[in-house]
A protein has these predicted regions:
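Extracellular/surface-exposed low-complexity segments
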Residues: 23-46, 51, 300, 319-321, ...
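Extracellular beta-strand/beta-solenoid scaffold signature
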Residues: 75-90, 104-123, 133-155, 163-254, ...
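Juxtamembrane/start-of-transmembrane alpha-helix segments at the extracytoplasmic/lumenal side
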Residues: 559-572
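C-terminal membrane-anchoring or membrane-association module
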Residues: 572-588
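Bacterial N-terminal signal peptides that target proteins for export
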Residues: 1-7
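Extracellular modular ligand-binding repeats in secreted and cell-surface proteins
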Residues: 443, 451, 479-550
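Bacterial N-terminal signal peptides
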Residues: 8-17
Length: 588
């Protein structure tokens, strides 16, 4: 019986030992067609040949870095606590997860010279596919300034439900970036098929002009302590692009292409939300949002081109696209190129401010706005609250009003020889400070600001020149002081016969009144002031009528005393006639 008990205990112990032995197997490799399992991940990596596939069987933390090209499979995580890893091959996470921590507790990589200023010096490719992920986390207080320092032809691929993330800690005031490209030829970042890319908290996000291609995915750079990006080609198809809360530029490109229902959101960046030196192209299905940017020493919503290369860059926003530029602390739209917004683009430029000129739009290139573009409630400290133009602007039928400028040109400021083409004001526009309907364009110059409600500083003068001009003009969409005409219809004693009419219009505009047909009355004469011009004082126009008898009144039988007098006479005559008839009958 005791012996049987010993056998049971031995069997249980052996089972537990075998179970623990199996649990210690952390990875496997195929060797000569057979699967070989390893209890030590460093041993598995060392045994692997270039381009081998290692299947992870558990989460692992290697102690040694490597050069060779490897693919890791299995839904487990491989974690390195290192800095200065020099890698020149192709590393693929196929459903697996790579984490590289370069912060407290990190050790230098052991394959060659290990620079402290980077987590990885990349000369090859990093790829996450099929739900795999790659994460870099670094602390600049520990001397690590870059997550990735990339050499020529280095690429990052994030494909098929994969994720890529760089997290920077304590980066403010420390030169460095999430991704630094030494040379850009052949390098790029490619994010496709329901994948995501995130740089969060780096000093600069990515720099030195890589190609970035995002399709059916999300791409975000946020909370950087300097520029989020720098140059290159950026193309988005059916994707959501976010550049948020960065202390420098948001999306900085050489060429920007947005299509297939993509949304680009650049919000709360210290410099420009979006800036492109060469090209901006947006198709009819996509949306651009660039709000609340430009709170640094430069910046704004969108900038196309550079002041040194006027009309060399090109912008095309297709009909149906939506562009919103709101609440920026500098020019909402700054254009040095040839920028065209097609008809039926939804363009809203509102509530922007600038310490100089052109809070809504500063244009030095050639700019065409769509009909019904909204440019309103923008405030410039100097000139051109709505638009400041020193190039060519076509703003036909744009809703350009209720903007403000500190010195001149609340809505429009056009410098000499610049071309400005615009339209008459619309009858449904009204001023925001008095709620009066806008009736025309008025001069709003530095010497004499438009002012209709202050008698001491009263100045109201309509702009009466061409709506296509190369002259220096400063204009405001506004209204004249309103005059009132009261039209009354009275009899000769001054009694009102019908209700009076009130008419209002701008001072010095013409007015014209008319008489009314009133039963049993006829007009005595047409008043001398039946026509005239509106004045500051109210004008009363009096139409006087006299009463007349109608044909019906002349045919009515007499009444009253006359009728009482004729009744006895009629009766007497009737008696005489009857008496005559009676006498005649007697004789017969």
């Amino acid at each position: 019986m005791k012996r049987k008990g010993y056998f049971i205990i031995l069997a249980v112990s052996l089972f537990m030992f075998l179970g623990n032995a199996e649990a210690l197997e952390v990875a496997s490799l195929m060797k000569d067609g057979k699967e070989v399992k390893y209890e030590d991940i460093d041993e598995a990596i060392l045994s692997a040949q270039d381009k081998d596939i290692i299947t992870l069987l558990s989460d692992v933390s290697p102690t040694k870095t490597f050069y060779k090209s490897l693919t890791f499979k299995g839904n487990f995580t491989i974690t390195y606590n290192v800095y200065g890893w020099r890698y020149k091959s192709d590393l693929t996470l196929d459903g697996s997860h790579l984490v590289i921590n370069s912060k407290e507790g990190m050790k230098k990589a052991d394959n060659g010279e290990a620079p402290t200023w980077a987590s990885m010096v990349l000369g090859g490719n990093l790829t996450a596919i099929n739900g795999g992920s790659i994460t870099f986390s670094y602390d600049s207080n520990k001397g690590v300034m870059n997550a990735i320092y990339a050499d020529n032809k280095a690429t990052i691929n994030v494909i098929d439900n994969a994720k890529f993330k760089i997290e920077g800690l304590n980066t403010s005031g420390k030169a460095g970036q999430g991704i630094q490209l030494d040379m850009t030829a052949g390098s790029g970042i490619f994010v496709k098929n329901n994948s995501s890319f995130l740089i969060d908290g780096a000093n600069r996000g990515y720099v030195n002009s890589p190609t970035v291609y995002v399709e059916n995915s999300n791409f975000t750079v946020q909370n950087c302590t300097a520029n989020a990006s720098n140059g290159g080609l950026f193309e988005a198809k059916n994707s959501k692009i976010n550049f948020l809360n960065n202390a420098g530029h948001g999306l900085s490109t050489g060429i920007l292409k947005v299509s297939n229902n993509s949304v680009v959101n650049a919000t709360n960046n210290a410099y420009y939300g979006i800036t492109s030196t060469n090209e901006i192209t947006v198709d009819d299905s996509s949306t651009i949002i660039s709000n609340e940017n430009g709170y640094g020493f430069i910046g704004g919503g969108i900038r196309l081109g550079t002041s040194g290369k006027l009309n060399k860059s090109v912008g095309n926003i297709a009909s149906g696209a939506k562009v919103t530029l709101k609440g920026n602390k500098s020019n909402a739209l700054e254009n040095y190129g040839q920028f065209k917004f097609a008809e039926n683009v939804s363009l809203e430029i509102t509530e922007n401010k600038d310490k100089s000129n052109g809070a809504g739009i500063f244009n030095a290139g050639t700019l065409t706005l769509p009909s019904k573009a909204i440019v309103q409630n923008n405030h410039a400290d100097n000139y051109g609250g709505g638009i400041y133009n020193k190039g060519t602007v076509n703003a036909i039928n744009s809703a350009l009003y209720n903007n403000h400028a500190g010195k001149a040109g609340d809505d429009i400021y056009n410098v000499t020889d610049a071309l400005f083409n615009f339209s008459k004001t619309s009858i449904d526009w009204n001023l925001d400070d008095c709620d009066h309907l806008i009736d025309d364009w008025y001069l709003d110059t530095e010497e004499k600001r438009y002012n209709v409600h202050d008698e001491e500083n009263y100045f109201v003068q309509k702009y009466d020149k061409a709506l296509e001009t190369r002259e220096n003009i400063a204009l405001k969409a506004a209204h004249n002081l309103l005059g009132k005409v009261i039209v009354k219809y009275v009899d000769e004693e001054g009694n009102e016969l019908i209700s009076s009419i009130e008419m209002t219009g701008s001072l010095d505009d013409n007015y014209e009144t008319e008489s009314k047909e009133i039963p049993n009355y006829e007009l005595v004469s047409i008043p001398l002031n039946s026509k005239g011009v509106y004045q500051k004082e109210d004008i009363t126009v009096m139409y006087v009528y006299k009463k007349v008898s109608s044909v019906f009144e002349e045919q009515i039988p007499p009444t009253g005393e006359n009728f009482k007098l004729s009744y006895p006479i009629f009766a007497l005559i009737s008696l005489i006639v009857l008496a005559g008839v009676f006498i005649l009958k007697k004789r017969i």
